[in-house]
Amino acid sequence: MSDPTYRVVPFAADFDLESFDCGEAAYNDWLTLHAGASVKAGVCAVYLLVERSEDSDRVVGYFAINPTQVVREQAPASLSRGWPLSVPAWKLGKLAVHVDLRADKLAQWGSQLLREAIETVIRVADAGGGKVIVVDADNSGLLDFYARNGFKATGLDGDLSLYMKVSTARKAFHP
């Protein structure tokens, strides 16, 4: 029996989404109940991390991105200096990894999937613009994960939003 291989593919409803379990019911439900409709409506793009073994494909992670904007007055000065009233941005709306992969601390699947999401944003920003990648951590426990992966907190009290300039991401991933 060979080791499984992994690939990231655009959302397709023909994968078995019901077996996905990241340990967070809201994220599991969003994938199975809302992702397809969101993609079809053009609200966001969803990408699946698929594990291929000898006999099947299994969804073991996903992320969703969508265009947004950041308003200068709502952004930290260190980010928004020199901006017009608002700038185009990309939001990482969802990022989830199956509980089976989260146990593999060596592979760091969460960070790998985040990197894939950032690479995807770089590609779409190169084609259509965007200055910033924004993520809203669902809880304070996720702030450290995103900070370890290059995102900066806004510094505003109680704000769980983090950001990374697209130019910073481009330099980090395409030196």
For the regions a language model picked out, list residue spans one by one.
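Non-catalytic substrate-recognition and accessory regions of acyl/acetyltransferase enzymes
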Residues: M1-L106, S111-P175
